[in-house]
Swiss-Prot record:
GO cellular component: cytoplasm; endopeptidase Clp complex
Phylogenetic lineage: Bacteria, Pseudomonadati, Campylobacterota, Epsilonproteobacteria, Campylobacterales
Compartments where located: Cytoplasm
Matches recorded under HAMAP family: ClpP
Keyword Hydrolase: yes
UniProt-recorded name of the protein: ATP-dependent Clp protease proteolytic subunit
UniProt cross-references to InterPro entries, sorted A to Z: ClpP (IPR001907), ClpP/crotonase-like_dom_sf (IPR029045), ClpP/TepA (IPR023562), ClpP_His_AS (IPR033135), ClpP_Ser_AS (IPR018215)
Gene3D superfamilies the UniProt entry points to: 2-enoyl-CoA Hydratase, Chain A, domain 1
Catalytic activity, as annotated: Hydrolysis of proteins to small peptides in the presence of ATP and magnesium. alpha-casein is the usual test substrate. In the absence of ATP, only oligopeptides shorter than five residues are hydrolyzed (such as succinyl-Leu-Tyr-|-NHMec, and Leu-Tyr-Leu-|-Tyr-Trp, in which cleavage of the -Tyr-|-Leu- and -Tyr-|-Trp bonds also occurs)
Residues making up the signal peptide according to the UniProt record: none
Role, per record: Cleaves peptides in various proteins in a process that requires ATP hydrolysis. Has a chymotrypsin-like activity. Plays a major role in the degradation of misfolded proteins.
Length: 195
C-alpha cells in the first residue's frame, strides 16, 4: 500500500491526527482491500477481535474491494466473522472476486450489501502443485475438499442449490451488484449511505 492519508480531528483536548484506517476503525469500519494473504488476514482478524472487545453488541462493517487470494487466509477471516459476537455487515466497493465474493456472501443475513457498479465473481479454488506424483495427489485432494467446502457454504449463503453453485463456479462467473442480489450473495444494492 502506498501513501496512507491522515485526518485531523479537533476535540476539546486539542487536535488529534489519525491515519485514515485507524479513524475508520473508530467507527467500526474494517477495510479489506487488495489480495487476501496471511498478512492481510491477520490484520483483518485482529481488527475484528479488537472491535468485539470494544463492544460485543455493536455491528462491524467489513468493506471489501478484493480480487481474492489465498483460501486458508480467507477462511481465517470467515471463521472469525462467525466466531465473534457482533454481526459483521459486508459491503462490496469496486469488486469482490473469488475469496472476496465468498467473504461478501458470509456477512450477517440481511446485512450484505454492494454499491451499484461493483462486480462480483465466484469460481472454483485455484491451486498449483509440483513434486512427486503422490504429493500432487495429496494437494489435488485437498483442493477438491476445499472446493466442496466453499461450494457448500456459498449454497447456504445464497438462494442456489449446491448443484447450481458447483456448475456456476466451474469457471469464472461474473455478476453485477443487482445480479448478485438476485443470486442471493447479497441482500441489497446501496445507492446512498443512510447513516
Amino acid at each position: 500500500m502506498g501513501y496512507i492519508p491522515y485526518v485531523i480531528e479537533n476535540t476539546d483536548r486539542g487536535e488529534r491526527s489519525y491515519d485514515i484506517y485507524s479513524r475508520l476503525l473508530k467507527d467500526r469500519i474494517v477495510l479489506l482491500s487488495g489480495e487476501i494473504n496471511d498478512s492481510v488476514a491477520s490484520s483483518i482478524v485482529a481488527q475484528l477481535l479488537f472491535l468485539e472487545a470494544e463492544d460485543p453488541e455493536k455491528d462491524i462493517g467489513l468493506y471489501i474491494n478484493s480480487p481474492g487470494g489465498v483460501i486458508t487466509s480467507g477462511l481465517s477471516i470467515y471463521d472469525t466473522m462467525n466466531f465473534i459476537r457482533p454481526d459483521v455487515s459486508t459491503i462490496c466497493i469496486g469488486q469482490a472476486a473469488s475469496m472476496g465474493a465468498f467473504l461478501l456472501s458470509c456477512g450477517a443475513k440481511g446485512k450484505r450489501f454492494s454499491l451499484p457498479h461493483s462486480r462480483i465473481m465466484i469460481h472454483q479454488p485455484l491451486g498449483g502443485a509440483q513434486g512427486q506424483a503422490s504429493d500432487i495427489e495429496i494437494i489435488s485432494n485437498e483442493i477438491i475438499r476445499l472446493k466442496g467446502l466453499m461450494n457448500s457454504i456459498l449454497a447456504q449463503n445464497s438462494k442456489q442449490s449446491l448443484e447450481r453453485i458447483a456448475k456456476d463456479t466451474d469457471r469464472d462467473f461474473y455478476m453485477s451488484a443487482l445480479e448478485a442480489k438476485e443470486y442471493g450473495l447479497i441482500d441489497k444494492v446501496l445507492e446512498k449511505n443512510v447513516k
